[in-house]
């Protein structure tokens, strides 16, 4: 059995009341911020405050019988290629690290939020998405937890 539950298993746990979005989000944040894990190379930004607020809101809605989508309450990350309002989108490049923060979310981010997904942070990527291998000399190259090549299944 896989030590890391699948998104399907986590969604089933939420639906059955075995776990809350707040519990899942705290577990995701803990793992992302663990200095012994890959979190420092995987995440370019962790937005714990916003994630905790979204998880609490999701749990409140679920308790009222409102489930917006199958993603309701599930912690997710967003590649540093997509704008998140109030955050700098670097696209994996140091050239953009001092760019002004995004004024609005990318449409895909709006859709995730509308679906009830909990965005815990932004993830590393190849500079300007120019490689399928996930290599990034500026922010580090994260390892794929399933021993495959980063950026795709090879």
Which positions does each model-derived feature cover?
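An N-terminal boundary/leader segment
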Residues: 1-53, 60-63
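Alpha-helical scaffold segments in soluble metabolic enzymes
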Residues: 9, 27, 57, 107, ...
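Residue-level detector of short coil/turn "hinge" positions at structural boundaries
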Residues: 20-21, 68, 119
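Short coil/turn segments at secondary-structure boundaries
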Residues: 26-27, 45, 70-72, 144
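Short, solvent-exposed polar/charged micro-motifs at secondary-structure junctions
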Residues: 52-55, 131
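Immediate post-signal peptide segment of exported/extracytoplasmic ligand-binding proteins
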Residues: 58-75
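Short glycine/serine-rich loop/turn segments
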Residues: 71-154
